[in-house]
């Protein structure tokens, strides 16, 4: 029956017939793909509009402020409730943390100082509970004392200073600035260690084993000629809704300017308009 037909012609005919059956399916698939792509674009557009709408509804968007200073000695940050205006500010003193350094040096940082187990107690003038650090006689070298103090969360940090010529001193620094965060140090259990690092809080007492190499002090400044003193160089309670960040003392009076910042609102409004136009256009084209 197939004597007059070539096998290749038969195969071509069958292939053409199969392709003809697939053509409608392929067209339908392309149509669905196009619709899915369009819906995806519309979904992205609506999500962008929702994001823009959320941004536009932020409570502080239209009350935002910006700050500028006539000096690098201080800067400021504000909340949305800050009142626009100018402030005259002069800084006469920065807050600083106390540092105590042993008067006597040790020939190395590994040799034990105490001959008996002892307790080192740190007492701050800020009303916080004293913190006691246990020191064993075997661990009473500069290194051992430093490590024990730094593990104790005692409100101070300890370090060893190489002062040269094979001499080492112990340094204790408060973790917080301000006069009220100055500490006193007492040692019980070993008189040698007490003589080496005891400090009764009176810097002029010759019996102290440590000297106050950096004095604990508060920041002092004037705002609109009103004296302000603070334990920190970051002051959030002097001006309503304004936080001052002190970096240095000033030369005379300087000016802090607070202005209304409309740039964020303008950006948010433009983003909302653009998103609204795009979503409206896409929605109309798919109806």
Regions inferred by a protein language model and the residue ranges of each:
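Bacterial flagellar/type III secretion structural subunits and associated motility module proteins
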Residues: 1-30, 43, 47, 51-169, ...
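Juxtamembrane membrane-water interface segments immediately C-terminal to a transmembrane helix
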Residues: 33-36
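Amphipathic, heptad-repeat-like alpha-helical segments
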Residues: 38-41
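Single conserved hydrophobic/aromatic residue that forms the stacking wall/gate
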Residues: 278, 282-287
């Amino acid at each position: 029956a197939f004597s007059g037909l070539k096998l290749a012609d038969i195969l071509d005919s069958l292939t053409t017939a199969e392709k003809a059956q697939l053509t409608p399916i392929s067209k339908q698939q392309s149509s669905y793909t196009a619709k899915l792509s369009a819906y995806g674009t519309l979904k992205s557009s609506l999500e962008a509009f929702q994001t823009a709408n959320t941004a536009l509804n932020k409570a502080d968007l239209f009350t935002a402020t910006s700050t500028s200073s006539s000096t690098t000695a201080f800067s400021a940050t504000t909340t949305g409730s800050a009142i626009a205006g100018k402030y005259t500010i002069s800084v006469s003193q920065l807050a600083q943390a106390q540092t105590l350094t042993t008067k006597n040096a040790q020939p190395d940082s590994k040799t034990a100082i105490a001959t008996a187990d002892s307790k080192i107690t740190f007492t701050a003038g800020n009303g916080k509970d004293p913190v006691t650090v246990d020191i064993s006689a075997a661990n009473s070298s500069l290194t051992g004392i430093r490590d024990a103090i730094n593990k104790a969360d005692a409100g101070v940090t300890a370090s060893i200073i190489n002062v040269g010529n094979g001499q080492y001193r112990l340094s204790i620094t408060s973790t917080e600035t301000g006069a009220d965060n100055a500490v006193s140090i007492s040692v019980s259990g070993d008189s040698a260690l007490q003589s080496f690092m005891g400090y009764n809080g009176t810097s002029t007492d010759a019996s102290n084993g440590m000297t106050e190499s950096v004095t604990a002090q508060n920041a002092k400044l004037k705002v609109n000629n009103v004296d302000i003193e603070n334990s920190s160089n970051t002051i959030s309670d002097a001006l309503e809704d304004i936080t001052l960040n002190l970096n240095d003392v000033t030369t005379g009076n300087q000016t802090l300017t607070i202005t209304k910042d409309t740039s964020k609102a303008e950006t948010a409004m433009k983003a909302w308009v653009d998103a609204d136009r795009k979503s409206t256009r896409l929605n109309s084209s798919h109806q």
